[in-house]
Each structure stands twice: as structure tokens, then as C-alpha cells.
């Protein structure tokens, strides 16, 4: 097991290994819907890809909340969305594009498919299954099992835009500060940034990557080591630590991570991002955190010193 998590620098050149090819392959057949489920981060990335390719009429966003997973309502909500899709003209089938959250929570996707009222095939992908599954090969097998097409989904209808997740807004906000922005994630969540517009091309962000075994064994210590090493090379004043859906669902010990980093001389300001909330919510919380952050040498408002004094005088 690694002593430090894999740390990757955000790049606008592309997300996961198969992220660009799998949706395109599904949309080649005009009667198939791609139903994207998971946190806002997961669904937003696929929404942007559908918009770029002119395939929004073949895209079904199914974002779920942390409460949906925690209360066991995810399968129920997904089944309801697919039953709605079954009533749309021209829909011959659905590829349910499952996320890490469904894998982690063991959502009963087979039951969802049975209740949909139309042919549904499940594609598992993402960092938690990449070690053991070949998504490209599985997709080809899945596509071969659909009945022959009898029509196409008409153009003209499109879902409402999927909002960017909280950490997207916070990462953008931190670009103007002397911060080392770090996203704690299993690895696939930056697709919602990668597939955006040109404004994200120079985004300064580093993020972790874990597989299923590393997450199962506990990865807080590895995260601390990875962040500490990255921060040491960054030359920045503090680490802006953000989270995403999988660390949130796992109940990762952010407090312990923050304390361990502080012991190693890394100033950390944690932003309570989950990937489930929207960017405006994340920015609102971030501004509140920045406005009240107390450093040892004094009180800072929006990262600027209000006055210079000793901590004992406050």
C-alpha cells in the first residue's frame, strides 16, 4: 500500500481514461438515452459533454443527494426517473451510467432496471471499479443486447442545465488567493471542470486518486502525506482543502487530516464541500470561512489582516 495518495494536477485536456469515448459510443445509436446518476459533479460532467456533442435530447440527468443514499432512497428515485423516460417518444432503451456512489452504497440497480418499463442496461465505471472492470468492453457487450432500433429520439427537448458542484465554485474562488487548492476525491470528480469552457484551462488545482482497495484500507494517512508533499512544492501560504462525494459518503476524518497537516506545518483551511451541493452554496460557505479564519499572528478578513497583534490579545 502506498504511504501517500496519488496526487494529480488538474488538466483541462481530458478527464478519465474512457470519459470521452463511452458517452459518444452510446449516443451513436439514436434511440438510446444515457441516464447519468450520482452527485452533481458526476452528472454535470456528462451534461457538458452532451451539450458539446449536441446530444442533450439523448441525455437524462439523475442527480442524487447525500440524503438519498443515506436513507436508501436512491433506487426509488432512479426508478421514477426511468419510468418518466419510458413515456418519451422514440426512446428504445437506456444505458444507466452508474457512478462511484452507487458502487459504494450498493444501490440495487438491477431492481431499478426491472421497474423502469423499458430496456435498461447498467454500466459501472469510475475509480472504484477501474481496477477490476473494463468499461469499454462491457459497453460493447451491453449495446449488443438491446432490441433493434425502431426509431430515434426526436431533437428539440433538452433537460435543464446541471449546476456545477460546490468544489467547482470554491476552486475558482481560491485562484485569486495565495492558496494551494486541493480536492480530496477518488479521482473522477474533476470531469465537471475538465469539460467546461476555456475559463477552466488555467485552473490551479491538485487532487487525490484512490482505488477501491486503498479506500477500503483507510486512506487518511496517505492523504496527509500526499497533501503535505504537494504543499511543500507549491510555495503557497495555505492549503484550501475541499472534499467530494466519496469521502463524504465514507465519512472520511477531515478533522484528523487537518490536525495531522497542522502538525507538519501545513496551514489548512477546510471548505466543507461534498460534490452534492451547488457552486453557489459552496462559494457562500467559502466566503464565510475566509472571513473568519484566524491565523496565529492575528485575525484575517477575506485573507487580509484586519490588524496585527498577538493571538493572546484577541
Predicted regions mapped to residue ranges:
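An N-terminal assembly and electron-transfer interface module characteristic of large anaerobic redox
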Residues: 1-314
Amino acid at each position: 500500500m502506498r504511504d501517500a495518495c496519488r496526487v494529480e494536477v488538474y488538466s483541462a485536456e481530458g478527464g478519465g481514461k474512457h470519459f470521452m469515448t463511452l458517452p459518444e459510443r452510446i449516443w451513436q445509436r439514436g434511440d438510446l438515452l444515457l441516464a447519468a446518476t450520482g452527485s452533481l459533479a458526476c452528472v454535470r460532467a456528462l451534461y457538458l459533454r452532451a451539450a458539446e456533442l449536441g446530444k442533450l435530447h439523448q441525455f437524462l440527468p439523475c442527480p442524487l443527494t447525500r440524503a438519498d443514499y443515506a436513507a436508501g432512497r436512491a433506487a426509488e428515485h432512479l426508478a421514477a426517473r426511468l419510468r418518466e423516460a419510458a413515456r418519451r417518444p422514440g426512446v428504445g432503451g437506456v444505458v444507466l451510467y452508474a457512478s462511484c456512489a452507487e458502487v459504494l452504497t450498493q444501490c440495487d440497480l438491477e431492481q431499478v432496471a426491472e421497474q423502469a418499463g423499458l430496456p435498461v442496461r447498467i454500466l459501472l465505471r469510475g475509480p472504484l471499479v477501474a481496477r477490476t472492470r473494463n468499461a469499454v468492453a462491457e459497453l460493447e457487450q451491453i449495446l449488443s443486447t438491446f432490441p433493434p432500433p425502431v426509431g430515434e429520439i426526436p431533437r428539440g427537448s433538452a433537460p435543464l442545465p446541471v449546476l456545477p458542484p460546490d468544489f467547482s465554485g470554491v476552486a475558482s474562488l481560491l485562484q485569486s488567493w495565495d492558496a494551494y487548492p486541493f480536492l480530496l476525491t477518488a479521482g473522477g470528480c474533476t470531469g465537471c471542470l475538465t469539460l467546461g469552457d476555456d475559463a477552466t484551462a488555467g485552473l490551479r488545482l491538485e487532487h487525490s486518486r484512490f482505488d477501491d482497495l486503498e479506500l477500503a484500507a483507510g486512506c487518511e494517512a496517505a492523504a496527509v502525506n500526499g497533501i503535505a508533499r504537494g504543499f511543500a512544492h507549491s510555495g503557497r501560504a495555505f492549503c484550501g482543502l475541499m472534499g467530494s462525494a466519496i469521502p463524504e459518503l465514507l465519512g472520511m476524518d477531515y478533522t484528523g487530516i487537518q490536525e495531522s497537516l497542522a502538525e507538519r506545518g501545513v496551514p489548512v483551511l477546510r471548505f466543507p464541500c461534498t460534490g452534492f451541493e451547488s457552486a453557489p452554496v459552496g462559494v457562500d460557505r467559502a466566503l464565510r470561512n475566509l472571513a473568519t479564519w484566524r491565523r496565529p499572528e492575528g485575525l484575517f478578513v477575506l485573507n487580509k489582516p484586519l490588524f496585527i497583534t498577538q493571538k493572546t490579545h484577541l
